[in-house]
Amino acid sequence: PKFNHEGDWVYYAEYNKQETSELKRISVFGGEPETLNVEVWDWQAPTGTLHIASNVDGQKEAVRLSISDSNGHPVIPGHGVIHSEGQNGMVFFYSSGEVEVRAPIGEVTITATHGFEAEKQVQKVKIAEGNNKVTLNLERIWDASAEGWYAADNHFHLNYGGTNQLDPEDILVDLAAEGIDIGYPLVANLGNRFLEKHLMNYENEGSPILKFGQEVRSHYFGHLNIIGTRELYWPWVWGPSYDIYGKDDRLNAEPLRFARNKGALAGYVHPVSVHDPFQEKSHQSIPKALVADGVLGEVGILEIGCLWTDEIGTAALWHEFLNLGIPMAMSAGSDVMNNFYRTMAIGATRVYVKPEGPLTEQSFLKGLIKGRSFVSNGPQLVFSVNGKEVGEVVATKKKKVNWTLNTYSPLPYDKVEIFINGEVVWSTKSKDGNSLSYK
């Protein structure tokens, strides 16, 4: 906010329901704020409009777009949420399949993606004064849902102190553009505020499926997510490092049991932030209650992939539980804050599940807890042993088995490894493309 020269008005910017910033002012003596409408934008250069249509396999589809002009300046639409991708600084937004932007005449570079199922397309377009059109045609490298696999982001936050105040409907295009079939935004605390409790009963029709879950936070014991119930666990937070409920003394096992009694799933989120959690200097990175809860069978799911943790270190810990014969299903969540400007894309880490029958929330949760799943931050993996898929049991006394692995990746990967009892028993480097078959 800024005062005017005379000191009788305060000027500030605020985002509206169309996720567009507005210039406003309010008297220092109070009263209703005024919106100052911008009648003309002076671009200091001639401009043109560009209508962008997007297809995937010949059908109109939502996509993620990043556009820059000849000077490298981002080109964005006049409304809707705009993000800056936190790792590479790429400014992006989502299109439902058609969008219009305005830009200085000259060349613009358009980068379009559709989740992990299609390689990115980069296209240069010349903009002239007046109206211009372009159609982007992306092709799938793998049609996951056609083979019964569905992608989910089980941990992210709709609103978390950012510039916009989003409604659930505002991210349906985002989910579709990223190829996410089911999303679980988690209600969570922000300090001593408990956000979005009213959204726990939210229902939407059609695809993608959007349901709300809960993040339960004990900083001391470790953070949990609960998905699959519309009831909230209380308290949301407790223990050391909190200015509320700081002296509350309870175990993480309580919310884990609460979820199980409600027919829901719960487990630890962003558990390990280091590459090797078993070194003496890094073992404190493992949440304090996770090992005990895991050994005692309290943990239903473990978030293997998350933006803020190390997938290799988390997977190493997960292998230790599996080696003890403890069935613990893998999950994943991006943990992005959707109303932030600087944030990663929703679904940047995700879990694919192959439910039995059509995709519903219940069939998804059943498939997830049965281990009919794989976690990914890019490559998609279809693995079978003696004809059995992930989540099934191979009953054999033979020391050798037949296996197949099909990989479908929008980006190159370094190598493929197969583990038995936490040890690498087969490995090969990637070559000759991103989508390969092994046996």
Regions found by a protein language model. Name each.
Residues 27-31:
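Short loop/turn segments that connect beta-strands within beta-propeller blades
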Residues 34-49, 55-58:
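Beta-strand-rich domain onsets/edges
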Residues 149-330, 334, 339-341:
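Catalytic cores of extracellular degradative/oxidative enzymes
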